[in-house]
Amino acid sequence: MSSLEKKESFGSLVQLEPDSVGEKFIHFERRTMRSVDLHIIPIVALLYSFALLDRINLGAARTAGMGPALHLEVGARFSICTVIYFIPYIILQIPGNLIIRKFGARRYLAFCATGWGAVQLGMGFVTTWGYLTLCRMLLGVFEASFFPGIVYIISSWYTRYEVQKRLAFFYLLSLTISGFSSILAYAFSLLDGKRNIAGWSWIFIIEGSVTLFLAVISFFLLPDFPELNTFLTPDQTQFVLRRVEEDRGDSVPDQLTVRKVLHHLGDWTLWAYGIMFMCCTLPAYALAYFISIILKGLGWGTTTALLLSTPPYAPAFASAVFFAWLSDKTRHRAGYILIQGLISITGLCLTAFSPQNNVRYAGIFLLNAGSSGCIPSILAYSANNVVGSSKRSISSALTVAFGGVGGIIASTVYREQDFPRYLPGLWVTLGAQFLLLFLVGATSLHFTRMNRLSREGKLAAPLEGQPGFFYTL
């Protein structure tokens, strides 16, 4: 279906034009998009923050006493418990995004949240490290579809140069809330002995209960795709669909087939986005799982290590939002990913090689700022350079799946025998940042070349099959 045919299929959609003065149209646009923002970003950010809390509280629980209780110090048990989560998390990313439209985003994502909340609650009652490992695997099953599903939904609502700010706010609000996981873990661990339950168990029980509560609420509040929404008026819905159609021509979902999925997976740039995402999530997961343990190894006590784990997340929010705003304003992605990658490298070098603990701690601030900012930047970079609902679904799922690979690497390269400095893990993380810079350069050169050939009329077909489309650098 051509872009013109798609527009004609909306009926009154094409009749919605700004008035002669334009003031009513501007007011209508602002009111509509403000409503979209308020109905999407806060609820998904809040729910995903608890997904992150439930995913990363393993390190805090171990610091609070779970390690000796479940004998996690024996061999590689802690790494096994950590890494098992990512196996179903990776495998189920693409299938989850392929069926999300079939079941409806709101119902499907609320079901996932209920599942992982129940598992998290159950983790508070495990008695052996084997049961803990089983719960971690189930956690990966239920969380697999949530993040790529939300990225898919957000990118369906906004134009290409609006999406990074929204992705940044969604992800960073979640990250900031989850950044208090160590403080919350410390507070919950103070319940040690209440009802004959260990302090580390209370961490899982309370956080799992809150997740279940939010999952019930989310069934009524989670957003769906634009054409299925219930909070906008018909004219507002048509307006949103129209602006997406004019921006990239994919407001109408294309039919999904096995042949089409395999065709999309043959695009090497989708795999490049995934590997780039893996590179920037590796340090994020390393900090999430090991920051309190690393700080304790630097000589701080349990309480201080847990409390000092939160401050590095504050400047990360400000930095990433600034780069997201600048990126959308200048309609440029790759250069800002490079800058934030260099910030990560600087922080890694300080943390790995400085002899002073305060400098190493300062390096964690820079590392967290760089990696946290790269995550929404890469998601926006990939979302801007695909056209079509089916390809957008595959791209977001594949990208986030590679984030799980970053989690596996982080879980295995930070080994018990390398405590307290974890130098081999830091070296691997540093190498991943250089790989990120290389792939950003490679995709930028490729997109520059394809844009030039398209402008010169030397291509047999329009880029991404969409006339007038050009890749975002």
Task: Describe the role of every protein-language-model region.
Residues 1-50, 56, 63-64, 219-253, ...:
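Intracellular terminal tails of multi-pass secondary transporters
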Residues 59-91:
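Extracellular/periplasmic helix-loop-helix junction of adjacent transmembrane segments
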Residues 59-60, 259-325, 375, 379, ...:
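Extracytoplasmic gate region of multi-pass secondary transporters
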Residues 109, 336-337:
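Primarily marks hydrophobic transmembrane alpha-helices of the MFS/SLC 12-helix fold
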Residues 90-130:
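Conserved MFS/SLC helix-loop-helix module at the cytosolic interface between two early adjacent transmembrane helices
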Residues 54, 70-71, 95, 103-104, ...:
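Helix-breaking motifs and short loop linkers at transmembrane-helix boundaries and internal kinks
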Residues 91-104, 318-332:
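Helix-to-loop junctions at the C-terminal end of transmembrane segments
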Residues 164-197, 204-211, 396-410:
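Glycine-rich segments within core transmembrane alpha-helices of 12-TM secondary carriers
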